[in-house]
Amino acid sequence: NYKGKESLSRVVMNQTFEDMKEIVRKNPFAQHIGMELLEVTEGYALGRIRLAKQYENIYGGMHGGCAYSLADTLSGIAASTYREYVTMLDASMNYLLPVEHTEYVYCKARVLRHGRKITVVRVELLNDEQTLLIDGSFTFYSIRKRDE
């Protein structure tokens, strides 16, 4: 049982940027990789992590799982901005360029389609120069509406 479950559920009920930042702050794995939430609007989330040695793969670039974790979290936040509890159904990522030689890795998550039950989110991971490194698509199922 997750210790912060009650407080996390309470935080998820609101949709302000500060509340979404609190969700990231209370997520132990997001904190472990130093994830920062920079912007949230309806259907959109922007965040970043600092590229660090402990996140590298054997070739010196960012490990794919670390990039996926950033995209997973940001796409979930973007999908949840419609006051719904969501769970991921499917995800696909295209690793276009190695993630290296950058201070930060940014993730932009934008809702492409928000339906009654299904939400599709496009993610883009970029370096400091805003070069597209990874893109992907995440599909979420809306479990139920949250109370206002």
What feature does the model see in each segment?
Residues 2-148:
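Terminal targeting signals and extreme-terminal segments of soluble enzymes
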